[in-house]
């Protein structure tokens, strides 16, 4: 249902598991090539490598937005202003999204963007790696879901909408969130030092 749109769709693709999954499912379901976008620095852009691999695998029309240190510095003040927070982690994570969305708005006809946001909160990530047991994992996951509006959703909503784009977050579907949160948290714990489940 997130793929129905009156305007052209685009997909943010970091090369990580979450955005790659969203893009792969969309590529299978849509009758045309999807358009994917990634962003990286002009030096040491390891994420671009993985995004390119995912894009090649699913056969998307892929665009890489390359940014410099100067681009990041110039974006800092407007990003802090639009977020309305000085939370360092949120600001750091927002700069790339802000710049890629600005590039999409300025250079394409894309007006709707799908992202892989919220899956970390549902299935665990760095902040749940050290949970001593399943109950602590679930407690932290529930806390992260309750606070989404202060961090990831804040970042995605504002960085995307300030660039006149509409955000769609498949992992945020309420039925899916209910299902994911009902999974035994012991199954989501990082027991093998392999990252996400």
Where are these regions (language model features)?
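ATP-dependent adenylate-handling active sites, centered on carboxylate activation for C-N bond formation
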Residues: 1-197
